Amino acid sequence: MKLESIQVPIKNNVLADYWSPNTAIHQFFEYEFNDQAFEKRAKHLAQHARDQKELTAIIRQFMEPLGLSQKANEHLQQLEQGAMVIIGGQQAGILTGPLYSVHKAISVIVLAKEQSVKLQRSVVPVFWIAGEDHDLEEINHTYTVHGELLKKRAYSERSRRKTMASATMLNKESMTQFIHTVVRDIGETEYTEALIKQLVDVLNESETFTDFFARLMNQLFKDEGLLLIDAADYNFRQYESTNFTHIIQHSEEIARVVTEKEEQLERTGYGKPILATREAANLFYVEDGERHLLERKNDLFINLAANLKFTREELLEIAEKYPERLSNNVVSRPLMQEMTFPVLAFVGGPGELAYWATLKSAFSVLDLQMPIFAPRLHMTIVTRHVEQLLREHQLSVTDVWNGKALEMKERFIHDVQDIEAKRQIQAMEQLLAEKYSELASYLEEQHLTLDKILVKNQENHAKQFDYLQQKIEQTVLDKHETTIRKFTTLQNELYPNEGFQERTYNPYQYFNEFGPMLIAEMLKQNYSIGKHHYLLYL
């Protein structure tokens, strides 16, 4: 494996400015991303140390059924003894979800190792699974390349209810069929049989979307000791009881400062990423595994569609006695994370960076300090076949991103078309049109009214000429299919859906090609968090 670092123009203006000094975005964050910030944040955490024994026990209890590695055990011991964490999270996507879920986990691990060395203190990697999320349409599918076409492959079982990923049971038969469909699209290699067995074995041990995701992630990163926790885990929810109480007690103020901060963010030119409102309670109520977003109205916490209505006292009692009935939203999740973990830095993507920019004052409302925001690593995997095609056509990866492969494909298709055949068909059409015109004139002289039939007949001939032209063009394309397919492959592999590969494909198509050691090889590379984009040549 070879690693190449390249500079790519950052289209997201929040992220672009975050990596630039002296830009307006930095006023929305407690820290910039530099060594001094990590030293300062570590000092702050040391001054606000807390007992982490109960938290450690909850993570251990969650992870034991997944299989605790020696390294994970070491990290749990360090956490119990007061270690700081680098934390990132993601929804419980099918087959781990898009590649950026894996890239985020790698970012967490890399940064934890780096800061452990720099600070000479224990820093452990933690992955927060957003099992409380209920938008299953976002996590129930993946993409593959089938022939030349990009195919969306979805798990067929649908739920009419907005149940959380952690409460949605998997249909093993449907999921097994989904796995076989995805792997069949990817194609047969020496690793395929073992890959299918591995996925089906993990599936058979899993009950829910979150369970399946957690087991796969643990399998991929157990040697690195990545600690996992499900946001919807029952024991974790009990641990968060007091924190929910704080959020409820300060609900109005949190909503107000987030709304004001987002308005300021918009005035500064960064838009409104979360569309905050002053009525937002920033909590969901969970009923039979289904989440209902609450808002405040006349001193009540309500969801009219679900016929829910609570007084502040009633909601505080729920937080105290039944915290599993509460769930965080985009605003309260980072606050809950800060109240729960000793967060040195949070690893997130461009979207998360934008909404975190609205939260600085919300942290202050709860007497918290916003941690360092670490943008995740961005990577593109270049297979041997793709690298060969790039060399053959003298293209770079950035050329493909900029549309050059598509331009070359269109130019090639234009150049190979049979111009003479097209000219002859046009001549035949012109000759026939002249003959129809002569016939129409003659019939008019004979007072034979057949205009409609003539027009219809001429239209039928025109359709036949079009059909003939299309068939000739398709035959020419078929003749040059091998060359055309090469350009299509470059586009599908490196810029699918007109976006980065990491947003479309899951990692298993690359495990199928490279083998089960891919993650270990990726983690051997020398990364640093920054504004570069990494190319990984397999």
UniProtKB/Swiss-Prot annotation:
The keyword Lipoprotein does not apply. InterPro entries: Bacillithiol_biosynth_BshC, CC_BshC, Rossmann-like_BshC. GO terms for molecular function: ligase activity. The keyword Ribosomal protein does not apply. It comes from the Bacteria. Keywords: Coiled coil, Ligase. Residues 419-445 form a coiled coil. Its EC number is 6.-.-.-. Belongs to the BshC family. NCBIfam families: thiol_BshC. Involved in bacillithiol (BSH) biosynthesis. May catalyze the last step of the pathway, the addition of cysteine to glucosamine malate (GlcN-Mal) to generate BSH. This is Putative cysteine ligase BshC.
